[in-house]
From Swiss-Prot:
The lineage of its organism: Bacteria, Bacillati, Bacillota, Bacilli, Bacillales. The chain crosses the membrane at residues 11-31, 39-59, 95-115, 141-161, 165-185, 212-232, 251-271, 295-315, 341-361, 377-397, 419-439. One of its GO terms (cellular component) is plasma membrane. Keywords: Cell membrane, Membrane, Symport, Transmembrane, Transmembrane helix, Transport. It is found in: Cell membrane. It is a multi-pass membrane protein. Putative sodium-dependent transporter. This is Uncharacterized sodium-dependent transporter YocR. Pfam families: SNF (PF00209).
Length: 445
């Protein structure tokens, strides 16, 4: 694969991998859950689980991809020939396909709001719940926004790894952090901002219970894009001498940093204007527009936030489409553009029902969930945990111990004792933790 596609620099890989992991959930859901689940105490538990569960799994995917330098399906075929383990790669493809089909819908909503912001459609100080409802229920806006988001994603992925995904990530990721810093400074300087900071960061041990711990455990690998073989695909484009441990730590730290920065940027502003903190689309499309349009030059800060969310959505979308393109093109750069468009169009078509699930298809439900929510539930609660579990079993079972050490040792000074710790974590702690979280989210306990 490396003859056709390769990262031009280690930094480019780290930014692209971090961009893949930094999705909308890290910005609009995680801070709220942290604030309502123990604040600083929850953050400490999350960081602990990320180091003990998420990071070992991320390294496992890096090893699979870099050792074989093949796509998500061929990697498993190479490491476990004559077996069915390569179905992990197909599972990752299907998961990313479904995920991007409804993720692109949210990306479309963001694009519509950005257009509304630049054309004066978000200049009022109230009534944003009505604007949001009319946006997502309008079939032309919902599907049109989704289509525009997918076209941007396809154009970037079609250009290749270094010329497309890497270059885009090198622009979008620094821009994302810069916007975060600007918005953090503005947010914490507002009157009453301290209440928001306390909500997010003040440790509250009374809020820590079994559910909180289980959620922190689940987020420790969900927020790193582990379990869908995206990181297998991205690491396949790495040179053999690159330091996998350093890269994995960098991606993990950047992801945790964004989650913390999001809380500091959002909640001081929300509390400053006496509004209730919320999560998900309500936060982005209702609460934040109300907040920023009540302050001087508020539309500028609102547009900055919308752009920030757009950048996070795009960098994740690139990786979801890339795993599909990599498998279908089999590393042939001449076929990349064709499969990027074919795959992207197929994802768009499958995602149209999700785009219409709050409008003309609002009466259609699957197990009492809208089409959009049903797809989200399938990916988040079933497919991703299953993929993460299979990878945690595959790595120590099918890759020889010495090969694992050689991959982690390459480009680093990793000691045997730390390798033994990592192997212990991915072999025992990771699968047990994933099973516990899975049983919890499906309601068994």
């Amino acid at each position: 694969m490396k003859e056709a596609n390769q990262w031009s620099s280690k930094l480019g890989f780290i930014l692209a991998a971090a961009g893949s992991a930094i999705g909308l959930g890290a910005i609009w859901k995680f801070p709220y859950v942290a604030g309502t689940s123990g604040g600083g105490a929850f953050l400490l538990i999350f960081i602990l689980f990320t180091v003990l569960i998420g990071l070992p799994l991320l390294l496992g995917e890096f090893i699979i991809g870099r050792r074989t330098q093949k796509d998500a399906v061929q990697s498993y075929k190479t490491l476990a020939p004559g077996t069915k383990w390569h179905w992990i790669g197909y599972l990752g493809m299907v998961t990313c396909f479904i995920l991007l089909s409804f993720y692109s819908v949210v990306g479309g909503w963001i694009l519509i709001y950005i257009i509304k912001g630049f054309t004066g459609g978000l200049s009022q100080t109230s009534g944003f719940d009505t604007i949001f409802a009319s946006t997502i229920s309008n079939p032309y806006l919902a599907v049109g926004g989704q289509l525009l988001f997918m076209v941007v994603t396809i154009l970037v992925v079609a250009k290749g790894v270094s010329s497309g995904i890497e270059k885009a990530s090198q622009v979008l990721m620094p821009a994302l952090f810069l916007l975060f810093i600007i918005l953090m400074v503005r947010s914490v300087t507002l009157d009453g901002a301290m209440e928001g900071i306390k909500f997010f960061l003040m440790p509250d041990l009374t809020a820590i219970d079994a559910n909180t711990i289980l959620y922190a455990m689940g987020q420790s690998f969900f927020l790193l894009s582990v379990g869908v073989s995206v990181m297998v695909t991205y690491s396949a484009y790495l040179e053999k001498q690159e330091n996998l441990v350093q890269s994995a730590v960098s991606v993990t730290v950047m992801n945790m940093l964004v989650a913390v920065m999001a809380g500091i940027a959002i909640f001081p502003a929300v509390f400053s204007f006496g509004l209730k903190p919320d999560q998900g689309p309500v936060l982005l499309f209702n609460v934040l527009p109300t907040v920023f349009n009540q302050m001087p030059f508020g539309i500028i800060f609102l547009l900055a936030f919308l752009l920030l969310f757009l950048f996070a959505a795009l960098t994740s979308a690139f990786s979801m489409l890339e795993i599909l393109v990599a498998v279908l093109s089999k590393g042939d750069i001449n076929k990349r553009k064709r499969f990027a468009w074919l795959g992207g169009i197929a994802i768009f078509i499958v995602g149209v029902p999700s785009a219409l699930s709050y409008g003309v298809l609002s009466d259609v439900t699957i197990f009492h969930l809208s089409i959009f929510d049903a797809a989200d539930y399938l990916v988040s609660n079933i497919l991703m945990p299953l993929g993460a579990l299979l990878i945690s079993i595959f790595v120590p079972l099918k890759i020889p111990k010495q090969d694992l050490f050689d991959e982690l040792k390459s480009g680093s000074n990793l000691k045997r004792k730390w390798f033994a710790v990592w192997l212990l974590l991915i072999r025992y702690l990771s699968p047990v933790a994933i099973i516990i979280v899975f049983l919890h989210v499906i309601g068994i306990f």
